[in-house]
Amino acid sequence: MLDTIELSKKLIEFDSVTPAKQDIFDFLIKIFKEQGFDTKQLNFDGDGSYEVINLMATYGSPQTNGKHFNFLCHVDVVPPGNIEDWDTHPFEPTIKDGYL
C-alpha cells in the first residue's frame, strides 16, 4: 500500500513549473500501473508556445457498467518566485510541526 506522506514528498520534489516535464508523468504512470490502473497520457499544444501534458488513469472498466474510478489531472505548478522568500525550498519537502 502507498504511504501518502512519502508519495506526496516525492511529488513535491519534482520541479513541475509550467510546462511540466515528462519525468513527473513517467513517475505517476509507474505508480498508477503498480496500483492496477490503466493510464493514458494526453498531450496538447496549449497556447502554441509549449506542450501541455495531462494524465488520465482508470481503475475498472466504465464500458461494463461496473464500478470504476477515473483520475484526470495536470501536475504543473506556478513558478515559486524568489526562493529566498520561502522558509524552506519549495521543491524540498519538509515536515515541520507535524505538517508537510
Q: Model-derived features: where do they sit?
A:
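Active-site oxyanion-binding pockets that recognize sulfate/phosphate
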Residues: 14, 18, 99
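Generic alpha-helical structural signal
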Residues: 5-6, 26
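Generic N-terminal amphipathic, Lys/Arg-enriched alpha-helix
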Residues: 6-15
